[in-house]
Design a protein with these regions (language model features):
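Gram-negative bacterial Sec-dependent N-terminal signal peptides
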Residues: 2-20
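Extracytoplasmic/secretory-pathway proteins
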Residues: 21-231, 237, 241-248, 253-748
Length: 748
């Protein structure tokens, strides 16, 4: 009960309870080589001090733990558990607690004979008539658990088919009917309040009904009435609900105060005074933690500065950690817009506490935060402020070399990899390539056991631009992702449970940055070398051979196209017969048609080597759908921060090992590729021209079918529909009764 009430409270006053922390994006599986919002899984190692490379994009609870270690005050075992419990709770939540247990309640309710059938219960209600577009969770899991527990006790006392049980269920239906209402409407729902039972009714039934009436008014936003009713129940010494009613009377005041257009601080202060009286009352001992949570909730809104300073001096248990981060979030981002921290706008009172000041300085990205971090480091010479300062400066900063020297001299085992990373970052910006390469190679040649996998991937990525040859590029450009994350609920949450244990089996892939270099810097001759390099896993060689062959065809390099076809064919049996036909073609016209037919069969055909997971090789929701009006593309991912480690915004770099001739080849090939039409139009023109010259070729109807299909699924423009219709007319006029004609009822 204590846990569920506390969790319910933390969510009940968030107007849009479906908003999750962080920046969610459209569903889609992406590889993560490092995380940007949290440390590596499992997080017990981070809680124990293996901080890896700290990022200022981490949630504040992770930075709270880091602050302690950076000040050489390791977390106790109990404190570590408190952090781990909070992180697990937050990351496992794929949605709010709202309506989390309605199904169990509905199922139990259905066992009562003669009750009407219900399918769902709406538990979210608009804030007000004027603010119908924002909603809050009106009834949480604990409400349905309490109802289920009460129903079971009623059945045990009166019998499942008794009038008392049926009347109680009917009244409870009215209670829960007030929880939701029509969305995006200014219509105020009509409250359904159970009627009081007659004086002659059973005493237990009357107590239950009194509680139901108060709860119904609470859910219906009749807060004055609900408070009065709950206070009356609290005064009834014989009611089993007296303590819970006293608690809910204060919640009625809080909800009334916070759902108002402007928060009613006077009413909150009154509620706070009542809560303190209840906390001091021994009868409320079982609800003490929940009452304290209410007191904290009020303190955040009445005197957040004092509340934060008090919390920051307490022992770090789960509740304290959560309360600090929640208070900071509400203070700095009251409308839940998730904007970046701007230190110059942080209230001065927040800066008085050293830990909070450090966290906000480290997270902020403005000039004021960097100046403050430098000033505090010069004053304290502490590791924590050194980390904040070196994170904020760039290579041209006048303090860069001083910070690099201090970072080299720092002996903190907890800051080691963060400081190492920023030394490399700053020296890379100063073009000290030899020093950077030597430092990285020393670590990467024998990675220490305490170096987290995500941090190791970041260091490999920094080494990538310094590759002296193709083998080095492949060594550092192919990495094992920490996980594949769909980002459909909690951001950066692995899809597979094994990844949460650090035992994921996701195969190595090209990183985003490496994929961009392959696509935008390598000529076909070097891409062919990648496709035949045994250092590269077979699935990645298949990827490169396939996409590079597509590119060779599109730019008209028949020699490379033939070479790549011979390489790609044995790597993918599904394409082998098409490649055989392509290689057997005796004229350029025939080869072009055979190539088009092959690409039409596999919508993953595009002229860009992919990073991350491979595209599907057939039609499907995750296929590449060929190419669009701009065939050359730069890859971006939801985890783009990974590749900003060594190159801003995933921008591809010029590999050191490419010759001037190879660079020129790549430039020429990319220029030709940029002129290629969008795929549906490209295929349509080839197929129509071939059909006109070779109408008897048995492959023509099949090609027309797939080319028309491409005009439905591919990237189209104003010319596509005319071409689609032209192919449709050709197919239906010249190949009547053909199996492919029958499968093509429309043009697009």
């Amino acid at each position: 009960m204590k846990k569920t009430i506390a969790i319910a409270l933390s969510l009940a006053f968030m107007f849009n309870v479906n908003t999750l922390p962080g920046n969610t994006c459209a569903f889609g599986s992406n590889p993560y080589w490092t995380y940007t919002l949290h440390p590596d899984f499992p997080m017990d190692k981070y809680a124990a001090g293996q901080l890896g490379i700290l990022k200022n994009t981490y949630a504040r609870s992770y930075l709270m733990a880091a602050y302690r270690y950076l000040n050489n005050k390791p977390l106790t075992t109990d404190e570590q558990k408190g952090f781990e419990q909070l992180w697990d709770q937050r990351l496992q939540a794929t949605s709010s607690d709202c309506a989390g247990n309605t199904e169990s309640w509905i199922k139990l309710r259905a066992t009562v004979p003669g009750v009407s059938k219900i399918e769902t219960i709406d538990t979210e209600r608009p804030v007000s008539k004027e603010n119908s577009y924002e909603s809050y969770c009106n009834a949480q899991t604990s409400a349905f658990e309490t109802a289920a527990k009460t129903l079971k006790s009623m059945i045990e006392k009166y019998g499942i088919g008794s009038a008392q049980v049926k009347e109680w269920v009917a009244a409870q239906d009215e209670v829960f009917s007030n929880c939701g209402s029509p969305r995006y409407s200014d219509k105020v729902p009509e409250a359904k309040i159970p009627k009081p039972l007659p004086e002659s009714a059973d005493a237990t039934c009357k107590q239950e009904r009194a509680y139901q009436i108060a709860a119904a008014n609470f859910y219906a936003q009749n807060f004055d009435t609900a408070r009065r009713d709950f206070e009356a129940i609290a005064a009834d010494a014989n009611s089993k609900w007296k303590e819970m009613a006293g608690y809910l009377a204060t919640r009625s005041m809080i909800r009334q105060a916070t759902l108002a257009k402007e928060t009613n601080k006077n009413l909150l202060e009154q509620a706070g005074q009542k809560i303190q009286h209840l906390i001091a009352n021994p009868s409320y001992a079982t609800l003490k933690e929940d009452l304290q949570s209410l007191a904290n909730f009020i303190a955040v809104r009445i005197s957040p500065d004092a509340h934060l300073n008090k919390l920051a001096t307490e022992k770090f248990d789960q509740q304290t950690i959560e309360e600090i981060t929640k208070t900071l979030d509400n203070y700095l981002d009251p409308d839940n817009s998730a904007t970046e921290v701007t230190y110059s706008k942080v209230p001065e009172n927040l800066k008085k506490n050293e830990m909070i000041d450090w966290i906000l300085t480290f997270q902020a990205t403005d000039e004021a935060s960097t100046k403050h971090a430098l000033a505090r480091w010069k004053e304290t010479k502490s590791t924590a402020w050194l980390v904040a300062a070196i994170t904020g400066v760039d290579a041209e900063d006048q303090h860069a070399n001083q910070l690099i020297a201090a970072a080299r001299a720092d002996k903190s085992p907890y800051a080691k990899w963060t400081l190492f990373y920023h030394i490399i970052r700053l020296e890379s910006g100063q073009s000290k390539d030899a020093s950077v390469k030597a430092s990285l190679d020393k670590v990467l040649s024998a990675p220490p056991a305490e170096l987290p996998a995500g941090a190791l991937n970041s260091l490999k990525l920094m080494r990538l631009p310094l590759s002296a040859n193709l083998d080095e590029f492949l060594k550092y450009g192919i990495q094992k992702p920490l996980a594949i994350c769909s980002d459909g609920g909690v951001p950066e949450m692995p899809d597979e449970e094994d990844d949460l244990k650090g035992k994921g089996k996701t195969p190595p892939t090209f990183t985003t940055l490496a994929g961009n270099v392959l696509t935008n810097k390598f000529p076909l001759s070097v891409l062919r070398q990648v496709a035949t390099n045994k250092q590269v896993p077979a699935n990645l060689r298949n990827n490169v051979a396939w996409t590079s062959w597509v590119r060779a065809v599109l730019v008209g390099d028949e020699a490379e196209a033939k070479n790549l076809a011979a390489i790609a064919s044995p790597l993918n049996k599904a394409k082998s017969k098409f490649f055989t036909s392509y290689l057997a073609a005796t004229t350029p016209e025939d080869r072009k048609f055979a190539a088009a037919l092959l690409m039409l069969h596999f919508s993953s055909a595009e002229p860009n080597a992919a990073s991350g997971q491979l595209m599907d090789d057939d039609y499907g929701d995750s296929s590449g759908w060929w190419w669009g009006a701009s065939p050359v593309r730069k890859i971006t991912t939801s985890n783009s921060d990974d590749d900003s480690d060594s190159s801003s915004d995933d921008e591809p770099f010029d590999p050191l090992f490419l010759t001037s001739a190879q660079r020129a080849q790549a430039t020429t090939q990319l220029a030709k590729l940029a002129k290629v039409e969008t795929a549906p139009n490209y295929f349509a023109k080839i197929v129509l021209a071939y059909a006109q010259k070779h109408p008897a070729d048995p492959r023509v109807p099949e090609a027309l079918h797939y080319a028309i299909k491409c005009t439905r699924y591919g990237a189209t423009d104003d010319a596509t529909t005319k071409l689609s219709k032209q192919m449709f007319v050709t197919l239906h006029s010249k190949y009547k009764g053909n199996v492919w004609t029958k499968q093509t009822p429309y043009w697009y």
